[in-house]
Amino acid sequence: MERMLELLQGHVDYIILGILTLMSIILMWKIIERILFYKQLNVTSYETIQELEIDLTRNLTTISTIGANAPYVGLLGTVLGILLTFYHLGHSGGEIDAASIMVHLSLALKATAAGILVAIPAMMFYSGFNRKVEENKLKWQAIEVRKAKQ
């Protein structure tokens, strides 16, 4: 356990923030793809609502998964940061410096903040895209009703 903590000591921030950065890049890629898709969408080109729904909801699971899990990745970074703070405190030889502890704890919390920073826009876009899915399905159904009446 001690060897693992020493190994993590200088790398926790890079690992956690690297994972969150990767999640952010994937998130932006999926968001941009969805925006471009919804802009060019023509619901009349679909024969069934199931085909439409498949295309409308593509990549939404990824966006939702990132939004739901980014805070946990950040929380993992915070827990590891606090664990390392206590590890250093235990190996300090009884010399407790409150200022140093506070600095380490505040730095540990940045991982949670970063996770939340990734999650909030992800969930906002996910909700907005879900509304677009419903609107486009309703448009398709309205067109089908008009066709049936003719």
UniProtKB/Swiss-Prot annotation:
Domain of life: Bacteria
Record's bilayer topology term: Multi-pass membrane protein
Transmembrane segments: 12-32, 66-86, 105-125
Keyword terms: Cell inner membrane, Cell membrane, Membrane, Protein transport, Transmembrane, Transmembrane helix, Transport
A Pfam match: MotA_ExbB
Compartment(s) where it occurs, according to its Swiss-Prot or TrEMBL record: Cell inner membrane
Cellular component, GO annotation: plasma membrane
Span of the signal peptide: none
Keyword Cell inner membrane (UniProt): yes
Gene Ontology biological process: protein import; transmembrane transport
Assembly behavior: The accessory proteins ExbB and ExbD seem to form a complex with TonB.
Family named by the database record: Belongs to the ExbB/TolQ family.
Free-text function comment from the UniProt entry: Involved in the TonB-dependent energy-dependent transport of various receptor-bound substrates. Protects ExbD from proteolytic degradation and functionally stabilizes TonB.
Protein name: Biopolymer transport protein ExbB
Gene label: exbB
